[in-house]
Amino acid sequence: MLELNFSQTLGTHCLTLNETLPASGITAIFGVSGAGKTSLINAISGLTRPQKGRIALNGRVLHDAENGICLTPEKRRIGYVFQDARLFPHYKVRGNLRYGMAKSMTGQFDKLVSLLGIEALLDRLPGSLSGGEKQRVAIGRALLTAPELLLLDEPLASLDIPRKRELLPYLQRLAREINIPMLYVSHSLDEILHLADKVMVLEDGQVKAFGPLEEVWGSSVMHPWLPKEQQSSILKVSVLEHHPHYAMTALALGDQHLWVNKLNQPLQSTLRIRIQASDVSLVLQPPQQTSIRNVLRAKVANCYDDNGQVEVQLEIGGRTLWARISPWARDELNIKPGLWLYAQVKSVSITA
């Protein structure tokens, strides 16, 4: 568990935190350049010293301005992966990985190398590696120091799109198989969508939203960040049943369900789905004899005018579902907050 209760002056702004972050999974730190993302993880790592407040990791105080406590970075047991890999050019990959390796990690070396898919790179020098390969080695080196927390500062920012796609599956695998919490700094919506369990949105040094990905993604805070083509909802669901004849899987969403193409997932397993706002249409009465398999009862929470379209925020079993309709449809159906209606979902994609 990471306890953050501090403030630090950043030019004309002040980075202010009073949050407790989980001891597992990936927490994404999201915001535009200058929002305070890197300043936050620099304060956690010990590279900078907040003027006020306290930082504690798993009950161990890392920084306490009032009591004059400020552990040096090497005493914090925190791994840090930068935008650039910062490997030692004169050491082979094996030497880079073993540099600073904790004795307790000796027996984990082969497993971690396998998880990151870098077995074939061990006897090569960094200069011969691609950007994605260098970052995998940098992540491995950080993990072999046996950290209690791993900080990743936009590790994909300097990579081209093919290299980003190469590295994402390894990060997803690490998140599933190692029991080390990660803070992942990014301004990429795609990276956050595929990796994050929780999201913290920073703006001018202030926390605007913090919580599970599906809650923050569907919030009014996050909504303006999503380009029109990415306006969507993220929902956590569980596998309810598999249809024996039509090769479809039912996913439980509260006391309702959605049908998707058959998944090779056991019953009761959980996953996240994404529904584009443009794939949701609205009707006032349950449709009869429709080809659309997914029709959900929902309540209108809010409506927003957006460049000639209307974004409708719906509540379904305590979750948020967005729909995009025309002003004509809104006026003709008299759609307004508090109205109960039916959402027809035309397409569902699996994100994790």
Swiss-Prot record:
It catalyses: molybdate(out) + ATP + H2O = molybdate(in) + ADP + phosphate + H(+). Residues 289-352 form the Mop domain. It is found in: Cell inner membrane. InterPro entries: AAA+_ATPase, ABC_transporter-like_ATP-bd, ABC_transporter-like_CS, Mo/tungstate-bd_C_term_dom, ModC_ABC_ATP-bd, Molybdenum_import_ModC, Mop_domain, P-loop_NTPase. Keywords: ATP-binding, Cell inner membrane, Cell membrane, Membrane, Molybdenum, Nucleotide-binding, Translocase, Transport. GO terms for molecular function: ABC-type molybdate transporter activity; ATP binding; ATP hydrolysis activity. The keyword Nucleotide-binding applies. PROSITE patterns: ABC_TRANSPORTER_1, ABC_TRANSPORTER_2, MODC, MOP. Pfam families: ABC_tran, TOBE. Its EC number is 7.3.2.5. ATP binds at G31, V32, S33, G34, A35, G36, K37, T38. GO terms for cellular component: plasma membrane. It is a peripheral membrane protein. Residues 1-229 form the ABC transporter domain. The keyword Transport applies. It is an enzyme of class 7 (translocase). Belongs to the ABC transporter superfamily. Molybdate importer (TC 3.A.1.8) family. The complex is composed of two ATP-binding proteins (ModC), two transmembrane proteins (ModB) and a solute-binding protein (ModA). Part of the ABC transporter complex ModABC involved in molybdenum import. Responsible for energy coupling to the transport system. This is Molybdenum import ATP-binding protein ModC.
